[in-house]
Amino acid sequence: MGNKFLLSVLAGKIGARLQGPDDEVSGIAAVDAAGPGQVTFLSNPKYAPQARETKASAIIAKQPIPGAGCAFLLTPDPYLAFARAVGQFHPPVQLAAGVSAQASVHPTAALGKEVHVGPFAVVAEGAVVGDRVTLYPGAYVGKGAEVGEDTVLHPRVTLYEGVRVGKRVLLHAGCVIGSDGFGFAPTPEGYRKILQVGTVEIGDDVEIGANTTIDRAALGVTRVGPGTKLDNLIQVAHNVEIGRDTVIAAQVGIAGSARIGNRVMIGGQSGLAGHIEVGDGVMLGGKTGVTVSLSAKEDRAWSGIPAMPHRTWLKMVTLLPRLPELFRRVTRLEGGKSPEGGE
């Protein structure tokens, strides 16, 4: 049975003000799916028509919505209040402390208080696992690795030897931290592997999505700063440094020794060349190809391949469909003929 709240109580927990009847609610749902006894939210005005038709008991919103026949939980930031409300109705699962008989914990490993180690999880020689850490089945903490308190490793997360993970970190299924960087020296006989002898450091309050891979440094440290959030299926190469509170969407690839600043936003499927810098506060649109260093002082938003100011890119893509006609017009004006295959 889920949590139930009077709307007045829920309002206090999410930083909102109740306007309307103080009904009891027991869940949260999308604006077009919510029913009686549930809360929904409106942060994008384009969904106001659906909000007017909702069957929800209450809407989290900036201001009352004319025509909506329900209560309102009013707040300056509906999206943040929505995030808090979800946490009230669906609190994180707390697994019972203890070590499964099917787990493997090396005698020299150190486990903190109230740690959960699930079946087939492995804690290797000299590893340190902090208080209240959760290791789901199949998680692997390598030799000498460190895991900070209140961190969660979902199934099949792999921390290689010597990796350091901070506090309150959430690592989703299948992510790999500390595998070898892609380093090879060409020789006449082929490629000789360069041993990757550095490590990876993950700061506090980081979240890393499923099947994301972060390579250990060749020398030194590959670093992800505090509060940064990485989506699924991201590749972070050796010696990359990512600042704090940066967000990176799925399928991004970051080549070796790139430097990403604080509060950067990177859209999905973007690619960043090695040894470049992306400054604090820069925003990259989806599929952006970054081949040179970028700074918010030049322009905050960048898109395209190669990366260019977003407004320039918008003008360019607007012109692209017109290029065949423009080409024909220029050809006629010059009195020439279109090249073979032209129209």
Question: What is the predicted function of each stretch?
Answer:
Residues F41, G98-P309:
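Structural signal for interior beta-strand "rungs" in well-ordered beta-sheet cores
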